[in-house]
Design a protein with these regions (language model features):
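Alpha-helical coiled-coil
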Residues: 1-7, 73-172
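Hydrophobic packing segments in regular secondary structure
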Residues: 2-65, 193-282
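Aromatic- and glycine-rich peptidoglycan recognition patches
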Residues: 2-4, 11, 22-29, 40, ...
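Long, contiguous alpha-helical "rod/stalk" segments
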Residues: 47-121, 180, 186-187, 191-194, ...
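Extracytoplasmic/secreted envelope proteins and their assembly/folding machinery
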Residues: 99, 113, 117, 146-149, ...
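Long amphipathic alpha-helical coiled-coil segments
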Residues: 157-182, 226-234, 246-255
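Catalytic cysteine-centered active-site loop
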Residues: 286-341
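A generic structural signal for residues embedded in beta-strands
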Residues: 346-347
Length: 398
């Protein structure tokens, strides 16, 4: 998807997936920052002052680009964790289900064995047992239950069904135990993957926070220097700088991406959309926490899932990618240019239906979206960003 300006695309490719072994930090050459004396000297000459202003503004936009790239990495790694946790939860549910089946099957097999023991005891008392019955009652000689059962040539015809059922139940219980063992091994592997993904996501969040702390510190200096060069107040200069930063962020894409319709999708259910909106807006200002889905902490797919759940609509698991697949399976994808309030939108680093979607938002209309983006931000309403925006939106209701 060629929606990023060349400079930002280069930054994101290097910063997002660490191609060629380079980190985001290594992607940006460390440029020397102007000293207070250099700024003071520049004030004495109009040309030098103009050049110094441009230099400082360039430094600020470069720092912003670094932060944007790190935010993207943090969102990608957060989605990797959510996917891994989804898989872990699915296997954990499988283990729990199998454990219940094993417990029930073991109890049934035990009960069947007791029934056979009662029959054998009765036969012994009635003198109907021979050597094979002795084997049945003597585990040390027989070796195992199935061998014991196979040796019972004198079990009465009326007991034959109980005998066969006991064997089947024993075999069924053993089969379930084998499945449970495999599932537990799979769960251990999935848990390890999820833990690694969580650690990677936390490291990305820490790196992002460190960059923001550095940028705040440097920006205080740059704002003061620019204010002195332009002979305005620091507060006014800060407003100018914030406008520059906002423009830099918003200019990472050109606008809605053209895409063909895949199939007919009906209009949304406005009542359900409004319920989802009302729920989501009640969370504005609440913190982002990786894996959060309420009651007062959220991540991107957590708030979309909970908001539509409040309206009785299932949009997928706690994963941006899974929510995209859910919309695709239900044939509810529409070209991004045809999106209406209530539709879900995704961000992806590949222009591929099967690629991961690292961020999901709720479209509010009029070019605005509601999101829980990353550890530095809270749940918020902001202008739609077009950089990395996937070309299809999803309509949870119709």
């Amino acid at each position: 998807m060629k929606t990023l300006r060349s400079r930002f695309l280069a930054l994101f490719v290097i910063g997002g997936l660490v191609f060629g072994g380079l980190s985001v930090e290594a992607a940006f050459a460390k440029k020397p920052y102007p000293t207070a004396q250099e700024v003071e000297n520049a004030r004495k000459n109009a040309a030098r002052k103009k050049a110094m202003i441009k230099r400082l503004q360039t430094i600020i936009t470069d720092l912003t680009a670094e932060q944007v790239a790190l935010e993207r990495v943090a969102m990608i790694k957060a989605e990797k964790y959510n996917q891994a946790k989804d898989e872990e939860d699915a296997v954990a549910a499988k283990v729990e289900l199998l454990q219940g089946k094993v417990n029930a099957a073991t109890a049934e097999a035990k009960q069947a064995k007791q029934q056979l023991a009662e029959i054998a005891s009765q036969m012994w008392r009635n003198g109907a047992a021979g050597t094979s019955m002795s084997l049945f009652l003597n585990a040390q000689k027989a070796g195992n239950l199935l061998y014991q059962l196979g040796a019972q040539e004198k079990i009465a015809q009326s007991s034959d069904q109980i005998y066969k059922s006991a064997i089947q139940r024993q075999q069924y219980a053993k089969s379930l135990e084998d499945q449970l063992k495999e599932a537990k091994e799979e769960l251990a592997a999935k848990t390890a993957i999820a833990e690694d993904a969580l650690a990677a996501a936390r490291n990305a969040a820490d790196e992002l926070q460190a960059k923001v702390d550095e940028q705040k510190r440097l920006n205080r200096t740059f704002v003061a220097q620019l204010a002195r060069l332009e002979n305005i107040s620091n507060s006014l200069e800060q407003q100018r700088i914030q406008g520059l930063i906002d423009e830099q962020r918003q200019n990472t894409g050109t606008g809605p991406i053209d895409a063909p319709s895949l199939y007919e999708v009906g209009p949304p259910d406005t009542n359900k959309v409004n319920i989802a909106f009302n729920f989501a807006k009640q969370q504005l200002g609440e913190r982002y926490v990786l894996g959060g889905m309420g009651p007062n902490v959220w991540d991107c797919s957590g708030i979309t899932k909970a908001s539509y759940a409040a309206a009785g609509v299932y949009i997928g698991t706690h994963s941006a990618t899974n929510q995209f697949y859910n919309m695709a399976e239900k044939r509810r994808l529409i070209p991004i240019k045809d999106a209406v309030p209530g539709d879900l939108m995704w961000y992806s680093y590949v222009d591929d239906f099967n690629g991961d979607k690292y961020h999901v938002v709720m479209y509010l209309g009029n070019g605005m979206m509601l999101e829980a983006p990353n550890p530095l931000r809270v749940v918020r309403i902001v202008p739609l960003r077009y950089g990395d925006l996937f070309r299809y939106a999803g309509r949870p209701t119709d």
